[in-house]
Every structure is written in C-alpha cells, then in structure tokens.
C-alpha cells in the first residue's frame, strides 16, 4: 500500500528560513550602524538608518512601450492632459491664521502651510512666545528646533530692518531682538530640553553662533539706547510691559543665560 508523499514544509526548514532572515537583518543593521558612524550623522538620521536597514528599496515598475493613442477623454478643451491640468490648478498653501493648540498642529502648519523662511517667521510671530511655550510644554523634537533656529537666524534681522525703515528708526530692530529672546526662552521650557539640545548635532552650532552673535549686538544697542534718548528704551520695553514684566529682554544676563542653555560657551 503506497502512501502519498507529504509536500508540506517541515518545521526544520521554517526554522532555517527564520534564522537566515534574522541573520540578514542583523547584518544589515550592523552595516547601517557602521555607515552612520562613518558619516557622523545626528541622532534622528542614525535612528532612521538603523530602523530601515533591512528594507529593500522600492523600484518603479517597468513602463510598457505603448504606442496606441490615448483616448479623447484624457485631454481637456485646451488640448492638455487632464492630469497636468489638475496639478497646475492645485491650491497654494493656506496661510495659518490661528494659534495651534498641540505640537502636531504646529508641525503640520509649519511644514505644509509655511513653505518659505519668511512664512515660518510670521507663523512664529502669530504663535507668540506664550503660545509656543504652551504647545511645546511636553517636549520639542530636535528637527523642529533646528528648523526654528535656522528661521530665526535668517529672518529676524531682515524683519527688524524693514520695520526700522517703516517706522523711521523707532527701535523696531530691538523689538525683533526682544521677540527672538522671548521665543528662545519659551522653547527652552520644554521637557527634556537639555537632551534635545544635545541631539541637535554639530550642524546646528554655526546657526546658533550666528544667532547669538546678532543678539549680542542687540544687547550693545539696547544698552546704548538706555543711556541715550529716553523714548528708545520705552519702545524697546513695550512688549514686556504688555506681558506684565519690565525687565529688558535684551539684557546681557538673559542673553548669556540663554546662550549657556543652548549649549554655547560664554562669549
């Protein structure tokens, strides 16, 4: 009496396949770690390289050479393809008009609706220091903080100069410097901020140095304004009077404390 052979995979073959898969994944992760260390990437990039090391790259499917004409409904009345018309008629990003209530809302508007540094800077002005402090009460990611520092460094002097020209040199640049100091202080109250600063990486250090160099210049200008005409200090302290504080935001003590908080040595 003959019995039919059992073609089901044995338990041993399954274990061998799983072991081979685990060995491949372990080798891929080790190679990704070595490659990340050699490239000296920051923590976020290192984590992403390790997590995706075992994944195979997605390749685009091969397009078949089809010489047949497209059907008439693929074209619009102007002769262009409908897909091209749809892509050209996409609405531009919507400018945010409301203060976000969560870090997720902030990040979505920051990335999606603020494409340029000037748009991002105006979004920071919309949120204000108090709004940013509330949004990032739990924590702020190193990537968002790095982008925020780059926007502040690139835009605050330009916005201050434009305001100076519009107001006839009424201390508007000092107001912008005060706003930057208040934003940096508000963000620094986030949870685990010291760890976030460590995760910024060396790429953010030049940005921080340029930003605080400009703030140090604002400190000198603020001191000169206090020693000179009386109307300039009043203009420089106006935003803090609204918030219930009469302390000059561009004081050397506050800027030096911020500089240490963001990991820079005292200048």
Curated annotation (Swiss-Prot):
Assigned keywords, A-Z: Cell projection, Cilium, Cilium biogenesis/degradation, Cytoplasm, Flagellum
Organism: Chlamydomonas reinhardtii (Chlamydomonas smithii)
GO-annotated cellular components: axonemal dynein complex; axoneme; motile cilium; outer dynein arm
Protein purpose: Dynein-attachment factor required for cilia motility.
The keyword Cytoplasm is assigned to this record: yes
Pfam family, one: RPAP3_C
Family the UniProt entry places it in: Belongs to the DNAAF19/PR46b family.
Coarse class of the protein's main subcellular location: cytoplasm
Name assigned to this protein: Dynein axonemal assembly factor 19 homolog
Region (Disordered), start-end ranges: 86-111, 226-250
GO molecular-function term, one example from the UniProt record: protein homodimerization activity
Biological process per Gene Ontology, one example term: axonemal dynein complex assembly
Keyword Cell membrane part of the UniProt annotation: no
Subcellular location: Cytoplasm; Cell projection, Cilium, Flagellum
Subunit and partners: Homodimer.
